[in-house]
Structure formats: structure tokens, C-alpha cells
Amino acid sequence: MSETSFNLISEKCDILSILRDHPENRIYRRKIEELSKRFTAIRKTKGDGNCFYRALGYSYLESLLGKSREIFKFKERVLQTPNDLLAAGFEEHKFRNFFNAFYSVVELVEKDGSVSSLLKVFNDQSASDHIVQFLRLLTSAFIRNRADFFRHFIDEEMDIKDFCTHEVEPMATECDHIQITALSQALSIALQVEYVDEMDTALNHHVFPEAATPSVYLLYKTSHYNILYAADKH
């Protein structure tokens, strides 16, 4: 699997390699070079509308490799998620296969502990899409179960059920801060999103939830999420 030819998630490569995506753009070059002072590597994800969910799922599970105590704690949380889905009105037979796919990869992280095995699962279209669909359903359930809070962040013309049905659950629908907030809280995953755009301004980032210590770093550029690796951690 080469850097330029990958299925869903690429091998890790030098962060400066993405300069090739914008060879003539001075602003992008400045921001990426500035970003490279804090992040050394990147994994690219396929731009299929599922990039946030796939990137978050892979990156967090990779961060757990070799950390038995954290894996055990996360497994306990994952085992509670069917209750969240049921409480939100989802029928078990409609989410069980997606839950099983996600739980299986968590067990793989615990028992195998290798990056190559994890990457293989996330690059298998069927398995990877099942994982993404589970994360989407869990995000939806978290929002539905906390409708009083989240309804303030969606358009007045759309209620929570419609928002989740059209903007969260379907594959290939892009996410916004609402979905990121919900999924990070649903699985207690702290993440930092670095924003790179064409505006001649300083780099900025957002931590979910605020003031948390991130275990996942994502790059948001041209409406797409890739995985970042912090210099002080990798």
C-alpha cells in the first residue's frame, strides 16, 4: 500500500508530503510547514463522506495499542453502548451486526496489538464500513438521548429526529461540530482538530471536549479529515 494508492486509510507518511497537494498555494504551504513543527506524520483517509468517523475510530484504537488498562476501560464503555442505542429507539436487530464489528476490532486491539492488523481491518471495505455505521448510530443515539441540549445547535426548521435521520445516520454524510461533540462524549474520546484553510490567518484548532488532553489529532483541510501524529507522542 503506497502513500498515493490506498483503500481507506494510508500508511503513515511525513506530514510535509501533503505539500504536494497544493504546490502553488503559498498560504497552504506556510500553514503546513508551521503544522510540521508540532506534528511529524499523517495518515490519509479516503474522501468518501465517512472520513471523520473512520479517522477517529482508527486513530483512537491505534492509540490504545499496548495499553491494557485503557483497553479494558474502553471495552467496558463499548459494552454499554447497546443500552444507549436501545434507549434512543433503535431496534437491536438493526444495530447488532454493526456493534459486533466494532467490538471485534476492540478485541483485536487487546489480543493482537499490532498496527498492521488494525490497519488491515480498517482497509477492508465491509468491516470498515460496519465500524463507521456503528459510530454513526452511536452518535445519533447520543444526540437523541440528549435532545434538550443538542436541539439548540440545529436549524429551527429541523427537529432532532430529522437531523439524525438525514445528517448523522446515513453513510457518506459529512459531519459538523455537533456530531464530533456527540461522538467524543459518547465514547469519552478527547480529540483535537487542526484547521488548515486558504485564509491568510493563523492556524487554529479545537479540542473536544474543551480543556481535555487529546489522545487523537485530526487535520481538517478542504472539507476532509486526516489523522495527525504529534511530535511529542510519536
From Swiss-Prot:
One of its GO terms (biological process) is protein K63-linked deubiquitination. The record marks 226 as: Required to orient and stabilize the active site H-224. Residues 40-231 form the OTU domain. One of its GO terms (molecular function) is cysteine-type deubiquitinase activity. PROSITE patterns: OTU. The active site is at residues 48, 51, 224. Its EC number is 3.4.19.12. Pfam families: Peptidase_C65. It catalyses: Thiol-dependent hydrolysis of ester, thioester, amide, peptide and isopeptide bonds formed by the C-terminal Gly of ubiquitin (a 76-residue protein attached to proteins as an intracellular targeting signal). Widely expressed. Expressed at higher level in brain. It comes from the Eukaryota. The keyword Aminoacyl-tRNA synthetase does not apply. Keywords: Hydrolase, Protease, Thiol protease, Ubl conjugation pathway. Disulfide bonds: none annotated. CDD domains: OTUB2 (cd22764). One of its GO terms (cellular component) is nucleus. In the structure described by PubMed:15258613, the Asp-48 active site of the catalytic triad is located too far to interact directly with the active site His-224. A possible explanation is that OTUB2 is in inactive conformation in absence of ubiquitin and a conformation change may move Asp-48 in the proximity of His-224 in presence of ubiquitin substrate. Hydrolase that can remove conjugated ubiquitin from proteins in vitro and may therefore play an important regulatory role at the level of protein turnover by preventing degradation. Mediates deubiquitination of 'Lys-11'-,'Lys-48'- and 'Lys-63'-linked polyubiquitin chains, with a preference for 'Lys-63'-linked polyubiquitin chains. Belongs to the peptidase C65 family. PANTHER family: UBIQUITIN THIOESTERASE OTUB2 (PTHR12931:SF3), UBIQUITIN THIOLESTERASE PROTEIN OTUB (PTHR12931). This is Ubiquitin thioesterase OTUB2. The gene is OTUB2.
